[in-house]
Amino acid sequence: VKLWGVLVAAAERAYSTDLNRARRDLWKQLVWKVEKRERRDITLDEAKSISTFVNNSSGRIGSKGAMGTVAVGLNQVLWSTQLQLSRIRMLTGSSMWTASPAARRLIAGQYIRMLGSIGAIIGVGLLLGGDWEEDPRSGAIGKLRFGRLRLDVFAGIPQYIALAVRVIYGEQKTQQGAIIPTRGDVPFNQRGVASILGHFLWSKLAPIPGGTISAFAGENVIGQPFTPWDMLR
């Protein structure tokens, strides 16, 4: 058991090191692009804006500031709080809000490149016989489908669109393709707004609180049978 713990810790360090190296390399490349395009040295604020974008695009928001402190504290309750907040930031484009025009153009260009790459993946998937869900009322929005296989090519970002649409617009699309209301006359055995919000939060809980709820409910977040003994596996 001790050896297994050492191996897991080493693998975690190796993963973090490689990911941080990739972040550094991308940051240096984007800084070089700004300096080459603008023919001047990059400013500190521009460097910070690019750093924010690089962190957000790779699943982090940083550990400094009020948001970072809150994210670290919430890790005891929510699974990978930094990742979840970074998905929201990528969706809203927050790294461009206070950026200089030069940094904003660069970051916007990166968004366009990412969308182009994702579009190419979706195109290939469709050519290979897959389906792509484009209805924002569906929980599978943005995903490629190959039978029972789902590929989340947008890295978890569209789930927040689906949640907002279901809550605000008041409709959802089931796995069978039916459009049903989430407010008012909700069909039997279907989720209303309160249940949708609760289930979404349940799906974002850390293993211990999430497993505790699953043990009391008798099933996990995807509806599979779950007992207290399953938490010990």
Segments from the language model and where they lie:
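Amphipathic interfacial helices
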Residues: V1-R233
